[in-house]
């Protein structure tokens, strides 16, 4: 088996990546496959932190446009990420992976409150740490959470799992001739206005020199290939 090129990673999974063909909720089969792929990394000695989105259950920004207070909507979205985190933790447990769920705010009896030093300790013990509830503040996306937590835990890279094979020059769903980039600099992403993640999250990663790799989590084995250094997906640094 190929050796990993990263010691510690932060894996960002969108809520949409967890939903099945009906486009809503959580598909247990997808969740279990992701848990098995994460288990492979743990068995290779990689320390894994995970940030989950909540878009499969709730989108605060969308309802804000319909008149809901944005702060209320974002709080509901944060709780959706906790629900996804609970599902992921359960799936990892069933795969015999030791995992800990942390929330950015207190949810006594459900999960631990985020604590930086405790998270580092658990990662060193080869426990998967799932970070939920975003940053704990409204107006920040889970992409921002992924970059923030990645920087805090001193991850080697943020791995952004998507439904496409990486970063393209245009939408591959609309243009079959879309070009896939293998390597990009932070400046190229901004200059070309490529949709990698929201600007706040991206500039946070850039300012702290945090590499980002974008890949297709729907492709079996892609996560392992990214971690072992193949040219899977797009690398931004």
UniProtKB/Swiss-Prot annotation:
Keyword match Translocase = no
InterPro entries for the chain: AceGlu_kinase-like_sf, Asp/Glu/Uridylate_kinase, Uridylate_kinase, Uridylate_kinase_bac
Subcellular localization: Cytoplasm
Binding of UMP occurs at 54, 74, 135-142
Q: What class of enzyme is it?
A: transferase
Which pairs of Cys residues are joined through disulfide bonds in the record? none
Notes on activation and inhibition: Allosterically activated by GTP. Inhibited by UTP.
The ranges of region (Involved in allosteric activation by GTP) come to 20-25
What's a GO cellular component annotated to this UniProt protein?
Answer: cytosol
The family database entries (SUPFAM superfamilies) matched by this protein are listed as: Carbamate kinase-like
**CDD domains according to UniProt:** AAK_UMPK-PyrH-Ec
The Swiss-Prot or TrEMBL record annotates one GO molecular function as: UMP kinase activity
Which pathway does it serve?
Pyrimidine metabolism; CTP biosynthesis via de novo pathway; UDP from UMP (UMPK route): step 1/1
Q: What is its EC number?
A: 2.7.4.22
Q: Name the keywords, alphabetized.
A: Allosteric enzyme, ATP-binding, Cytoplasm, Kinase, Nucleotide-binding, Pyrimidine biosynthesis, Transferase
Q: What reactions does this protein catalyze?
A: UMP + ATP = UDP + ADP
Quaternary structure, per UniProt, is: Homohexamer.
Similarity comment: Belongs to the UMP kinase family.
Q: What is this protein called?
A: Uridylate kinase
Q: Which organism is it from?
A: Haemophilus influenzae (strain 86-028NP)
